[in-house]
Structure formats: C-alpha cells, structure tokens
Amino acid sequence: MNAQETLDTLKSLGTEQNRKIYRRHGAGEDVYGVSFAHLKDLKKKIKIDHDLAVALWESGNHDARMLAGMIADPKRLDARTLDTWVKGLRNYVETDALGGLAAKSPHARETMARWIASDEEWTASAGWRVLAQVAMDDDALPDEYFERFLSTIERDIDESQNRVRHEMNNALIAIGIRNPALQEKAVAAAARIGKVEVDHGETGCKTPDAAGYIRKTVERKK
C-alpha cells in the first residue's frame, strides 16, 4: 500500500467512540480513531516499510503516526529527521511512539541528551522516554551511565513540566529494574522524591509510585 491507500484504510477503520477517547488523550482533531488491534493487524500486513512510515508520520494524522511507529526501520532514522519529528509532537502517545523509535536508532544517546535538555515539554518528555527504553534494552551500559541520571531526576523532577515529570518517573523505574545495585539506588531516590504529581487530564491514567513499581517488577522476574 502507498501512503494514500494506507490513510484511506485507517480512515475506514476508525470509530467515533475511539475518536472521542483519543481526543481526551490529546490526539487533536486529525484522528480517525483506529483501535490498537486494527493497527497491529495492519502492522502484520505491511511489516517494515520505512518510506511508508515516513510519509505516514509526516501526514500529521494521529493514527497514521501510531502505525508509522510500528512499521518504521529505526536504523534508517537520521538525527535530523528525529529532531524534525519531535518538534511536531502533540500528545504523550505520539511522544512514547517516537521515543521508542529514537531509542533503537543509531543516534539514540546523543538524541536523548539533546531532547532532555530542551525547554519544550514534549521534546524533553521524549528524551526521558528514550532513556527509559535504553535502560531496558542496552545491557552493555555500565551502572555509572545511569547513576548520573538518577541524580538529575532527583534534583529536577519537582520543578519539571507536567509530562516531563511522568517520563522522568518512568525512567527512574526503568533504571531501577536493571539490576540489584541500581534498584537500591533508584528506590532510595524515589523515597527522597516522594509522590510525583502529574495532571493526566480527563483520562484514567496515573503516574505510578516508582519504589513500589520497581519492587513489584523485580519480584515478578524472580
């Protein structure tokens, strides 16, 4: 399928109920309301098609961007494209999708550093999302790499923007479940931070207690 055919397919699969739900989560007006199950079916059909993914993301449609995140080839994402895309983020769902892609790109760590330093809420959120993914995926990085981010999170989370606080908390959790040494340090940092307040708007989403979440996740892994 080309980009227009894919957009037409997405439009045909959308529902008004999903559009209402997605808009509560920040999707805006350009949304078809395609279920995650239908997106997964399309992903299976298309597999990896990076050129199509680029066209879909740049269409600006929310559902198209979700599918783009599933069919893109992260190895073909250059830093310029990532920096262009991050400027167009409008909600946390797109932020999570782009952060997950960026974490698997050849430019993950340098992109993460630029984004974390940004004053833009969605850009900084995406940077912390990259860090969380790197913490979960890259077993080769030493503990020292992540310890400095624990210090940054503890120092800055209270004064950070709303969605940035949520992603920093998620990064804290991801670091804490890497190994016992980082678990101890992350749980201690979470205790000093205390409850992380995040406004999730008209949704049922919540920001988890980092220390409790880390402990439960580690226990399940045993």
Stretch-by-stretch model annotation:
Residues M1-K222:
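Alpha-helical scaffold domains
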